Amino acid sequence: MNEKIAVVTDSTTYLPDEVKEQLRINVVPLSVIIDGKSYREGEELSATDFYRKVKEAENFPTSSQPAPGEFIHLFENLKEQGFDTVISIHLSSGISGTFQNAASAGELIEGLNVVAYDSELSCMAQGMFAVKAAEMALANEPLDQIIQKLDKIKQAQDAYFMVDDLNNLQRGGRLNGAQALVGSLLQIKPILHFNDKQIVLFEKVRTQKKALKRIEDILQKAVQNKTAEKAYVIHGNDLAKGEAWLAQLEAKFPEVTFELSYFGPVIGTHLGEGALGLTWSIK
């Protein structure tokens, strides 16, 4: 008899509600703290509300990971529903303790095999793992094949972000003050990416147009190497900017399936409003 596998992820995937429902993906929320008040991402605070509240806030927002107890409660619940195995897929362990909390909680549940999976990224780049794992679990595919597929996606995957304002990264501890000041004066648009589970500076470019062109050049190589079959354009509360880039990319790369996503509250605390990202991998 096949094992019954459940898929868990966290709110930083920013998956559409209909996808979560259709694929039965369980989501544990991270929280954002604005002026001392904590909001559960996606449950008590939408992306639109977050960016509005940040403009009115006195202090810079911070984020917090789910407590191990949240995972224990969910895992126990899934066990009661008859699941034998849980694949728990989370944002990079290099930027959050969420993955570690899921892994620790999983060890405490008897009679349930919890496999914690570090996406080493976040946002829809992480969402791609959750979607694929859930599709395969619903098709009754075995655990080892699901993990093998996730590893193949990880091998092919890449993600680049361009931020509009360096101050958020500096305040979030991602960039020092001098670099942020120089960046603001020179109108530098830094391109960031994930390297060894951390968000790091990839290149400094003078204009947004040049930054987007540079990311497109990297995508071009990935398309040639057959590692970019599906891609997501991700925007920070700027739908028009996201849609415009999406249209350009669809025209330029007809062989790639593109979709639009967004940076929600937790990731928005680091990247800020107006950020743009692109992630891709195999299907």
Curated annotation (Swiss-Prot):
Q: What are the protein's UniProt keywords?
A: Lipid-binding
GO MF terms listed in the record are: lipid binding
Instruction: Tell me where on the tree of life, at the top rank, the source sits.
Output: Bacteria
Where is the DegV domain positioned along the sequence? 5-282
- The answer to whether keyword Lyase applies is no
Does the keyword field hold Transmembrane?
no
Q: Where does hexadecanoate bind?
A: 63, 96
Name the PANTHER family on file: DEGV DOMAIN-CONTAINING PROTEIN DR_1986-RELATED (PTHR33434), FATTY ACID-BINDING PROTEIN TM_1468 (PTHR33434:SF2)
**Role noted for this protein:** May bind long-chain fatty acids, such as palmitate, and may play a role in lipid transport or fatty acid metabolism.
User: What name does UniProt use for this protein?
Assistant: DegV domain-containing protein lmo2514
